């Protein structure tokens, strides 16, 4: 059996993880009073965002404990199972390295790793593709190879409402900071080569949706092979225009909609929304 392992930056919550047949290792969020929350476990995203609004000091995020990975690998080895690990970009977190180091420490075989070179909705979409390929009977090596190809066609585009969270978290490129500092301007960000990058800018919320839709088309449209994944931090209403656009203008299947979790939401902040998708160049 192939076990699929990922981290909570994929924003796959426990109930969905069980449904998909994947294991999610939680990252941590430390509040200003020292309380440590396990991402996706100890607080719902909505509960966390209520806390975040009241925080004078931005919570910090950290990678999982290596022991969590070690126990997973040992259990898989004891059962004779193979493991495919899919993690957020190594450019944004040490989680990828932590997972690999833990595998070396317990000296397990039949473990392959894929750096998603993405995060959040993008990472989660790659995990869902892995589940789809596993169900189709692909081998461990075949799935890993397919994912390495697929991630070249994976895109995440998001609109940020308040840049103070990215700025305080130290994950704000200079170009985004300049754009976001202009009155009424909402920057669009993406993930390029595993890092946060500027994708465009727009004036006001309506302009942000138009800019996002334009970017989707510029990036090659949306593949019908894997449903797109829309996400929001605060309100599901934020992605309703995205759903309508995809169905009415691109004739896409209705995208999956998920709330963005605590770790990514710490840096994106309340009011962010986005879309992850594979472009039409994807071949499976």
Predicted ranges, named:
Residues 1, 59-60, 86, 117, ...:
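Short, contiguous strand/loop micro-motifs
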Residues 1-2, 80:
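Local beta-strand N-terminus motif with an aromatic residue
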Residues 3, 9-23, 28-30, 35, ...:
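Mixed-charge interfacial surface used for oligomerization/domain docking
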Residues 35-85, 89-108:
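Class I S-adenosyl-L-methionine
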